[in-house]
Structures are given as C-alpha cells and as structure tokens.
Amino acid sequence: VPFGKRKEIGVVWKYENKELKNIKIKNINKKIEKYSINKSLVDFIDWFSTYNMVSPGLTLKMAIGNKDNYIKKIDSSLNKYKKNTKKYKLNNEQKKALEYLNLVNNKFDVSVLQGTTGSGKTLVYFERIKKIIDKNKQALVLLPEIFLTNEFKSRFEDFFGFEPAIWHSKITPKNKRIMWKGIIENKIRLIVGARSALLLPFKKLGLIVVDEEHDSSYKQVE
C-alpha cells in the first residue's frame, strides 16, 4: 500500500462500509496472492495487543516481518533428514503420560507434564510432537533462554532425524525470511524458539510446548 512517498506491506484487518468525509482514501496497489493471515492469528493478535496494552500494528509487525519476506525469492525448505536416528523406549510412567496427552487429540487442552530432572519429560513430549507432525500439523517448543536452543538442537535431530527451525532475536535476517516462508507455507513443522516465536504465522499449529514453564525468563517487567 502507499504510505507517504513509500510503499509498505499492509494487511486488510476488517471491512468498513461507512464513508469518511474530507478524508482521501488511497487505493491498495497490489494484493499478495500467495500469503494470507488466517483468522486464528488475527484473533490472537487482537487478544495479545489488548492483554499486553500495545497497539495491534506493533504486534502485527512482529508477526509478518518486513517486506523482504514477500518480495525476495528464497527456498523455504529447511528440514534436512538423516536416515539413522536413535531409538528410545518409554518406561511405564512415560507411556501413561503420553497416553493421556494422546487422548486430548484435536481438542484444546492445557496439560502440565511434571517430573524430577532426568525423569524423561522431554522424551514424552518428543513422542507427542511426532504424532502432531505425522498429521501434517506444526509444533512449537518454547524455551526460556536463547542459549538453550543449541543444546536442544542436537537432541531434536537425534530423535526426529532433522534439525528444527530455531527462532530467536540473534537469527540473521536471511534465515528469518527462510523460516517465515517455510512456516506460513507449512513446509516447516517443528519450530524451537524464544517467546517471540509465538507470533510466527503458523499455518496449522497443533501443539505448543512451554519447556521449563515456571522460568521467570518468560516474563518481561520493564
């Protein structure tokens, strides 16, 4: 859309039929056919903006990124599969936890997976993520600190056979564009990141895992 003397990426948020007197309305220059924001993301941005007392525009900017996401041609294929993955076996407690999570199926539910350090909680939600990905849906794993993403990267690769998409503030603009396109096209199905990853334009988000949910790093007070 025209914005002053420059062109910017805009989003049609809602329709209005009323006429505005003494105000010149500019036309949309071009519609980007390939990308659209689904209603669930629109509703989430509205809620997020109200809850955090920020303007929807600022929240939307975090979600859609800059115009390079739309005008630059980039291969959005990220997953690099390997043939040999490690085999893991669940114990009885892990099986019970996974059975409960699987019963939820496609319904909305909030579950707490609690256990001591080293009890195998990660393996349980890995198994749950695998079922979500097998259904052609996306899974998001949130981590409280950026430095934890590299530690988790190898563990994910050992289990799933491919590297997850890693999202946080230190990622280069080019890699962010690759991930953004892959996520909105549902080509990237496993995303690991800091809290800002919540605003990515997921096409078919089926599961969110908040690892170390009690960690104060998820909160921002300033």
Q: What residues fall within each predicted segment?
A:
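Accessory, non-ATPase domains that flank or precede helicase/AAA+ motor cores in DNA-metabolism machines
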Residues: 1-194, 198-222
